[in-house]
Amino acid sequence: MANSPSAKKRAKQAEKRRSHNASLRSMVRTYIKNVVKAIDAKDAEKAQAAYVLAVPVIDRMADKGIIHKNKAARHKGRLNGHIKALNLAAAA
C-alpha cells in the first residue's frame, strides 16, 4: 500500500491509466474481430472495408504503446494475407 503522498498519487494515476488502456485494447480487438468475422463469412468486400477501418486504429494504438509495434505488424500482415487468399479463392 502506498504511504507517501507521491506514491498514492502514482498509484491513482496507474489505476486510471490501466483502465483507459484496457478500453483501448478492447477497441483494437473489436476492430480485428470485425475483419475476422468478414473473412470467416467469405465476404471479400466487407473484409477489405473492415480492414481499411482497422489499420489506422491498430497503428495508432501501436504508436501510443497500447500494443507492441511488432504485434500490430503481425495482426495487419496476417489479416491482409487472409484477405488476399479470400480474393484469390474468389477469382479462381
From Swiss-Prot:
The keyword Secreted does not apply. InterPro entries: Ribosomal_bS20, Ribosomal_bS20_sf. Residues 7-20 have a biased composition (Basic residues). One of its GO terms (biological process) is translation. One of its GO terms (molecular function) is small ribosomal subunit rRNA binding. Gene3D superfamilies: Ribosomal protein S20 (1.20.58.110). Disulfide bonds: none annotated. Residues 1-23 are annotated as: Disordered. GO terms for cellular component: cytosol; small ribosomal subunit. Binds directly to 16S ribosomal RNA. Belongs to the bacterial ribosomal protein bS20 family. This is Small ribosomal subunit protein bS20. It comes from Pseudomonas fluorescens (strain ATCC BAA-477 / NRRL B-23932 / Pf-5).
